[in-house]
Amino acid sequence: MVSNSDASLNKAPLPEGTLSVGVGLFISGITAYVFFKVGQEALGKEGFKPIVVLWFAAFALMPGFFMPVEQELGRALAHRRALDQGGRPVLVRMLMLATGLGALLLTGLLIASPWLTREFFEGYGIVTLALIIALFAYVPFHLVRGIASGSGRFVAYGLTLGIDGTARLAACTVLWLAGIDSPGPYALAVVLAPIVAIAVVAARHETRTDDGPPAEFSEVSGNLGWLLLGSVMGAALVNAGPLGVDVLADSTETAKVTVFGNGVLLARVPLFLFQAVQAALLPRLARLAAKGDLDEFREGLSLLLKVVAAVAVLGTIGAFALGPPVLDLVYEGGLDRRTITLLALASGVYMVALAIAQAVIALRGHRLVALGWATGVAAFLVVTAVSSDDLYLRVEAGLVAASTVALVIFGMSLRSLMSAGHAPDADGFSDGIADAPLKP
């Protein structure tokens, strides 16, 4: 017999804000694809290469380091809101943490800037400067998103996603129509767009917080260090492909970096379907976790993994069947069926690994998840180095191997934790989402 509470869990509508955030994600994804198209029309594949590298480098570093800060801020603010307490002291604490992380990252970028300019950005120092500027744009961007989610302002959260992508595309289009054919202005468009989103949300008074009791760092997850390591490693892995091609390509193969980046974008389409599935199913799992119902948690998790696996399989089959003609239509091709299929396979395996990683974190396995992503990154480096002399194939093999290694580690960790009777933690789902730093 099913209790009323169980029935309400099964029949519960989508959680508040799902539609707003979903629309924002959709706009963010579409504008990213169009940005790559317009940028290549303006600069050509070779000229657009520094922008491709900037894109994947920025979205490895910024969400990797600051998504956990955003999610922990949101969790702490939501907890205070439930207690009818103001969250400004929490914001101040998280601002201190974000500033410290930003200072460390800034120091590293400044030290590495001559090397980055020479080896990655084709001698364009302004592109390196854009990567540094990204810090000053994305730190407040993630804090604003944390305020929005923790305060229940999901329309504002969706606006940050949509406006960020729209502003970037609008700036790129204006530059193209104006005949600008230097990478510098396009690089600045990539990293300054979040400031537009921040300004719009601030103008709507959606960044306000109220004064409240003093905040201690104990209000932040005690596992923030492991979360941060896992987030950085996971973001590095999902963005490693084009960066790996760039490192291995010679001076005559710059266009191949752009072409590979196009393929990676196309292969990530299932990841955005995953985010929609996640938005629909994870809140129900969180409610089951709050009840401490391990049996129903297992059933809900099984459903999530089946759906995610189905999306991964369909994405890989779709890439095999339709990938080359779609790439020809949108980006004038450049990749064969093997490459786009292996990229989709790697993306699909990564997606399943990500879903399991979130469950492991919900079972308080933060350290295991950090270990899994770090081992995956190590596997990528080893396999890419020794697997083949073919530029694309060695990176494709590295991505598939890395995602598979992470998946195996997470699967074994999940089985071990559940066999040991570890109870899921509702707050862990917030941490789990922080371990998913995705960007088109």
Residue ranges with predicted function:
Residues 15-28, 54, 63-114, 290-316:
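Membrane-water interface segments that mark the loop-to-transmembrane alpha-helix transition
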Residues 45-49, 113-131, 254-257, 320-348:
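Interfacial segments at transmembrane-helix termini and the short loops linking adjacent helices
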